Amino acid sequence: MALTRHDSSFYTDYLERRNEIGPKLVIFMVGLPARGKSYISHKLRRFLSWMGFRTKIFNVGNRRRVADAATTHDATFFDPNNARARELREQVALDTLEELISWLKSGGKVAIHDATNSTRVRREALIHRVSQEPNISFMFMESICTDPIILETNIRMKLNSPDYRNMDPETAIADFKARTNNYEKAYEPLGDVEEKLDVSYVKVFNVGKKSIAYNVRGYLMSQCVFFLGNMHIADRVIYLTRHGESEYNREGKIGGDPPLTDQGRKFAAALARFAQERHPIAPACAEKSKADATFGGGGGGQLQLWTSKLRRTVETAHFFDEQYEVTTMRFLNEIYSGLCEGMTYDDIKKVYPEEYRTRQANKLIGRYPGGENYMDVIERLRPVVVELERLSTDVLIITHNVVMRTLLAYFTGMDLLEMTLLDVPLHTVYCLKPKPYGVEIAYQRGVVVICITPPSEH
């Protein structure tokens, strides 16, 4: 199913209106190398984009490599006593800011300046330039990491960066540590100076373990700080599945609160076995199964079970051992179809032809009479997403088609227009493993490539 210009124009107009509210925001990252700045940047971009705010990361390191491709950027390039290199780095940071400002003026909403920005001289230059622009607010976001395990992991990940990709690993690590030592010589953390200037900032310690915020103002800044306070990097698995087949699925009706069919109950029983194999309740079964090598979680065997309040998801959880912790929540209910609840698509075409055409043109903002659209679902799922970011144990979520699409769009960073076209079949478990720069997704039978295929009309 292809999107036409007519289809996408509805969403474009909606985004224009949504992004008009409040000033634009620049987030300046601050911190030593390998402290999680890019990790935080990508998490924020994904969260804010999913909420409908145009968000983009501007990485100074990428521009630096292009601007001075003839020079080897080893540790000596970052020595504060290397005047030529220091001048180049400062200029590249300002050039990146110019590109960032130009993008904001052309319709962007949130821009992230991903760099060390570790000296007061650099930060004062950034403040001076961005303060000249009307309707652009800014804040600094410093990532501090003192956990040796996290640091070692971050350093190992740096081996995949363009600066070290073709270098012997041990040589690369030694050079990177020397680079960090050079940064430490000139590093000046956020604090009293920024407060005297009344600059907004947040300091994040050990990727979300602790946060300190100062002068945080406005909706976007507060959302960023709130989100950062709930993230972590612990391993865990998020299982997503739709309810078993319901009577309405069989009859081609939407919404409502129907029971499961016999086929749906068979899936419910199979789902309970699936969970027991991977997260056994009994201590004697604590040893992970062979299948757990693919699907096992980071929660040490503990599994939470979440369902919507609707009958078909509650019935899908019926066969689970009573010792599993079960939470039911309205946030996970299917998109509400208003006056069209319990109708078939043919019925809707006949009774509400104009509303049907509008919704088919763009499901993100189109809705049936008295019902929700996809953006409404995103808004009510925001607390669920934040809770999933906070949760350090594994969780199995039994929910519905549109909610599944919306959650998958968040975790994969999928474009919101593509989200409405995502095929999410019944009786299938998606196993999501959040990683530093994305998410691994697998079915029970192996690795999955999500394809955008013609979906059901719902």
Where are the language model's segments positioned?
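Conserved substrate/cofactor phosphate-moiety recognition/catalytic segment
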Residues: 38-101, 107-108, 122, 150
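Phosphate-binding P-loop
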Residues: 17-23, 104-105, 388-390
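The conserved Walker
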Residues: 33
